[in-house]
């Protein structure tokens, strides 16, 4: 993948079902990923999943893609007000701050990039939190689908685009990469572009 940046890589040894976690940390609640380890500035979050459990499926659910979630819940989540190009394109001082943190990261302080943020990433984080915490979203079933991944399967997802939750399953590997938006063939479908070109969600 051209110019992609490696993100996190983790092993998931625990059973996903029945964990007592705060909503913001619960993977069994449907959500869209936002930049948890620094700003993406609209670049895509691509994740690879490998299921290692030899006997038990890994069960996922979804409520649809970002354009659908945005159209249905964007106003309730507080990300539709003032949406448009100015809502997601950073100003000059924000761009300077990003370059400073990137320089520190290149100089051997990789955790400096975690401090980075952007207008786009703040809106995506707001939507992520809304999906996990708001009763009006959590109680909904619109667009709900369920998937079962059998033992020894692998799959890849743009997790900023496809809403998802892991309902059950144990033993999996997860690798994350950040793919430049400029390298995407269907750029117009990316959340960064949708937030600019579709500022008013459909009720």
Language model regions located:
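Non-heme Fe(II) oxygenase catalytic core, chiefly the N-lobe of the double-stranded beta-helix
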Residues: 1-123
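Catalytic core of Fe(II)/2-oxoglutarate
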Residues: 59-62, 129-203
């Amino acid at each position: 993948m051209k110019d992609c940046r490696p993100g996190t890589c983790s092993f998931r040894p625990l059973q996903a079902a029945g964990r007592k976690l705060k909503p913001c940390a619960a993977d069994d609640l449907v959500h869209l990923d936002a930049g948890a380890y620094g700003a993406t500035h609209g670049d895509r979050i691509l994740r690879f999943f490998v299921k290692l459990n030899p006997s038990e499926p890994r069960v996922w659910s979804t409520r649809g893609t970002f354009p659908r979630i945005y159209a249905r819940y964007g106003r309730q989540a507080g990300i539709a007000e003032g949406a448009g190009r100015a809502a997601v394109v950073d100003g000059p001082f924000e761009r300077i701050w990003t370059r400073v943190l990137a320089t520190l990261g290149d100089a051997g302080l990789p955790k400096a990039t975690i401090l980075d943020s952007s207008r786009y990433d703040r809106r995506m984080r707001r939507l992520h939190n809304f999906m996990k915490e708001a009763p009006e979203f959590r109680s909904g079933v619109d667009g709900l689908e369920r998937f079962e991944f059998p033992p020894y399967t692998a799959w890849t997802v743009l997790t900023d685009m496809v809403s998802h939750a892991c309902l059950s399953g144990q033993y999996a590997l997860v690798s994350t990469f950040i793919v430049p938006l400029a390298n995407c063939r269907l750029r117009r479908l990316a959340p960064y572009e949708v937030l600019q070109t579709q500022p008013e969600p459909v009720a």
